Amino acid sequence: MEKTFLMVKPDGVQRAFIGEIVARFEKKGFQLVGAKLMQVTPEIAGQHYAEHKEKPFFGELVDFITSGPVFAMVWQGEGVVDTARNMMGKTRPHEAAPGTIRGDFGVTVAKNIIHGSDSLESAEREIAIFFKEEELVDYSKLMNEWIY
């Protein structure tokens, strides 16, 4: 089953959106298989944002993601990567549709509440950065037979 990595960023944690975000993905029918509240270190941030290392905003990305706790999650389900991207909304909150997480709660590009993997490959890489294999729980959810 497909997995994706999602992270409530420091602004989303401080604004108390963890429960709202988890509820949206559960109501959609996805299965939470890993989650933790954590402080991102500069080393982890560097790995996570490696593709932006040469860009002028790299330092700002690292500073922000390390500025407070984040809530890291792994979700599982059919089409979860693409569906999660749609549920999050466009990166720029003012362009995100109402009803999406960023459309409802985002204010600026820098503080847009949530990060989500943009492909299966990114999901695999990001899950490996933030979670050890033993931190992911594979279990049967009775609801799945009603969804898939």
Curated annotation (Swiss-Prot):
This is Nucleoside diphosphate kinase. Belongs to the NDK family. It comes from Bacillus cereus (strain ATCC 14579 / DSM 31 / CCUG 7414 / JCM 2152 / NBRC 15305 / NCIMB 9373 / NCTC 2599 / NRRL B-3711). One of its GO terms (biological process) is CTP biosynthetic process. The gene is ndk. It is an enzyme of class 2 (transferase). One of its GO terms (cellular component) is cytoplasm. PANTHER family: NUCLEOSIDE DIPHOSPHATE KINASE. ATP binds at residues 9, 57, 85, 91, 102, 112.
